[in-house]
Each structure stands twice: as structure tokens, then as C-alpha cells.
From Swiss-Prot:
Its EC number is 3.1.-.-. Serine hydrolase of unknown specificity. It is an enzyme of class 3 (hydrolase). This is Family of serine hydrolases 3. Induction: Regulated by RFX1/CRT1. One of its GO terms (molecular function) is hydrolase activity. The keyword Hydrolase applies. Pfam families: FSH1 (PF03959). One of its GO terms (cellular component) is cytoplasm. Keywords: Hydrolase, Serine esterase.
Length: 266
């Protein structure tokens, strides 16, 4: 029996490993058929949801709906916190990198990285030079085969910019929702444009800030992974095509899941 392939799954802000696992059920089931096991680490920073929106201008905002998280669970986490006085100013605590290093050593090595929102932003940064940033050897973690970003963005703080100047070798799929009001299109495209032309693919779905679970969409993602990891794809160093036409209209399954997500019913 061939060894199981593994994917590192990085959840979004105000989520957790369990919440992200529940919200990627369709993707997980289909990737399992392709021989992949998905691993969900949980960010080390606990978040008080009640303290998120305290100012007068923020009152009435719904954390569960805005961050595509659970309305019932108070056990939610984040990978880093922004400076309240400057959106583009933040530092990722070294314990985050230490935690992920140990997680890779204990559960890896991994074939790919998939992230959502803040987790995709962190994942995109890590993938610029995964082993150097996490202090891993090539024996501990061989070269990653792919990276998928759902609503991910380029880290804005100046201290992280030099990493994006590298020629990133990991093939990437960048997914954004046309109705996403949490992460602006310009921020998603900034991460996308950090990759060389022959190492990046853009996929747009008609939904908002969530990971779609419709069968046509999941099939496209799985087909992309199969194409990028196939012997032919690796030899020709080319990105497989994705069919945008399948997503011109919202899928009923996605709409229902999004409504359920807003109710916090995982």
C-alpha cells in the first residue's frame, strides 16, 4: 500500500481546527479519495469574540458571519493580531512558527498547504521559503508540491516583504469569492501576483468569504491538484487549466452551506 499523502490545513481568524475541518468537509472527502489525509493544527492565540467589536462604529457586526466561523463556540483562535491603530502593522509571534515546526515534525511531512483567510495569508508567507522559515531540513520536510489559498492575502507588515521577492517555486491556486467583503480583491491579488506566471492559477467563485463545498467547485480544485502533482505536470512545469464557466451561477449547495454557517450549525 502506498504511503498516505498529507495536506497541512491552516484555519482562518476567529476559527479553530475543528471549525475549519467542519467547513471543508466536501473538500476533505474528495481529497481522501485521491489518497490525501488533511491535518488541522489550531492556532495558539485564543480570541475573545465579545471583545472583537467594541467601538460604536463596529456594534452590530456579526463575528460568526463575517469570519465564517461558529456562532456557538467560544473556543476560537488566530495566528496573529493586528495593531488596532494600524491595520498593516503586526508581528507574528515566534511561538507560532515554533508550534508549526513541531507540528510538521510530529505529523508530516506534507505534500501541500491549504489555508483560509488569515491562515492562507500565513500559509502564503510560509511557502515563500517553508523550510528556512520553520527551520526544517529537506529530510524533515521535502519540497512542497502545492499551495491553495482561499481568500488569502499578502502579509502587509514591512518586516515580511523581503520574502515575497523570492522566486516562489511551489505551484499555487488562489481562490476568491466575488461577494467577499472581508478580504478585498486587491489584497488577494497582491498574494497571487507574488508568484511567477507559470506557478499561479486564479479561480473565482460567485460566493462570499467561505470555502465552497459544491461538487463542481471541489472537482475543479481536485483536478488542479491532480494536474499539478502528476508526473507530466511536474515535467512540463505548467499550471493546469481551471474551467471558470462552471461557476458563473451560485451553486445551491454553497448557498445552503453559507446560510448554515451563519447560524453556526456545524
Amino acid at each position: 500500500m502506498s504511503e498516505k499523502k498529507k495536506v497541512l490545513m491552516l484555519h482562518g481568524f476567529v476559527q479553530s481546527d475543528k471549525i475549519f475541518s467542519a467547513k471543508t468537509g466536501g473538500l476533505r472527502k474528495n481529497l481522501k479519495k485521491l489518497g490525501y489525509d488533511l491535518y488541522y493544527p489550531c492556532a495558539p492565540h485564543s480570541i475573545d469574540k465579545k471583545a472583537l467589536f467594541q467601538s460604536e462604529s463596529e456594534k452590530g457586526r456579526d463575528a460568526a458571519k463575517e469570519f465564517n466561523t461558529s456562532a456557538t463556540s467560544d473556543e476560537v483562535y488566530g495566528w496573529f493580531f493586528r495593531n488596532p491603530e494600524s491595520f498593516n502593522s503586526f508581528q507574528i509571534d515566534q511561538k507560532v512558527f515554533n508550534y508549526l515546526r513541531n507540528y510538521v515534525l510530529e505529523n508530516g511531512p506534507f505534500d501541500g498547504v491549504i489555508g483560509f483567510s488569515q491562515g492562507a495569508g500565513l500559509g502564503g508567507y510560509l511557502v515563500t521559503d517553508f523550510n528556512r522559515i520553520l527551520n526544517l531540513t529537506d529530510e524533515q520536510q521535502p519540497a512542497l508540491k502545492f499551495f491553495i489559498s482561499f481568500s488569502g492575502f499578502k502579509l502587509e507588515d514591512q518586516s515580511y516583504q523581503k520574502e515575497y521577492h523570492r522566486i516562489i517555486q511551489v505551484p499555487s491556486l488562489h481562490v476568491r469569492g466575488e461577494l467577499d467583503e472581508v478580504v478585498a480583491e486587491s489584497r488577494i491579488m497582491a498574494l497571487y501576483e507574488s508568484w511567477p506566471d507559470n506557478k499561479r492559477t486564479l479561480l473565482v467563485h460567485p460566493g462570499a468569504h467561505f470555502v465552497p463545498n459544491s461538487k463542481p467547485f471541489v472537482s475543479q480544485v481536485c483536478n488542479w491538484i491532480q494536474g499539478i502533482t502528476s508526473k507530466e505536470g511536474q515535467e512540463h512545469n505548467a499550471q493546469p487549466e481551471v474551467d471558470r464557466k462552471q461557476f458563473d451561477k451560485p451553486q445551491l449547495e454553497d448557498d445552503l452551506l453559507d446560510m448554515i454557517d451563519s447560524l453556526g450549525k456545524l
